[in-house]
Amino acid sequence: MKIILGSQSPRRKEILNFFSLPFEQVSPVFDEETVPFGGNPEHYVLSLSAGKTKSLRYQFPKDILISADTIVYKEGKVFGKPRSKEEAFQNLRELAGHWHSVYTGVNVSNENQEIQQFEETKVLFNSLTDDEIHQYQEKIHCADKAGGYMVQGAGSLIIKKLEGCYYNVMGLPINTLRLCLSEIGIDLWKYLKD
């Protein structure tokens, strides 16, 4: 039995590598556009992460699968991964000076059960000029990040305040993952690295 991280995200891999838990990273073949947003961000991220898990279950029928999906959400609007630098610019402009929420759905399953939980983190951006947004975009590859930004590194220049789990904004909330893994008998505490 293997543990499969069903994600192409280097940040999720980085977070899981905080622990000595052996895993393989496999990109799910799943079109996120096929899941409609029904107005509830919690249900939406859970549906997305479940879809990723389902897309891998046939390939790994007896293994433990970990999948996650993250969105940025503000006043009824979902900000996913931007399709262009221009869209990322507009996202950052719209988020600048305002609070928004980052939701991540976590799905952990084995051949017998599926555990799902979500995490919400509230983020307040600094007010940003167009020039500051352009400078930020010159340093950050935005295409694979919900909302077109990241919390780590240069993200500290655009984020004024954060309420909740920092690692949720990176894409994999550690405590939520710990709770899901414990439901299938894996104690993440036993895999702490020195």
UniProtKB/Swiss-Prot annotation:
E.C. number: 3.6.1.9
* Reactions catalysed: dTTP + H2O = dTMP + diphosphate + H(+); UTP + H2O = UMP + diphosphate + H(+)
UniProt GO BP: nucleotide metabolic process
Q: List the disulfide bonds.
A: none
| InterPro entries recorded | ITPase-like_fam, Maf-like
Q: Molecular function (GO) terms listed? A: dTTP diphosphatase activity; UTP diphosphatase activity
- Its chief place of residence is cytoplasm
- Compartments (UniProt record): Cytoplasm
The alphabetized UniProt keywords are: Cytoplasm, Hydrolase, Nucleotide metabolism
Which residues are responsible for catalysis?
69 (proton acceptor)
- Presence of the UniProt keyword Cytoplasm in the record: yes
Identify its protein family: Belongs to the Maf family. YhdE subfamily.
Q: Which PANTHER family match?
A: BIFUNCTIONAL DTTP/UTP PYROPHOSPHATASE/METHYLTRANSFERASE PROTEIN-RELATED (PTHR43213), BIFUNCTIONAL DTTP_UTP PYROPHOSPHATASE_METHYLTRANSFERASE PROTEIN-RELATED (PTHR43213:SF5)
What's the protein name? dTTP/UTP pyrophosphatase
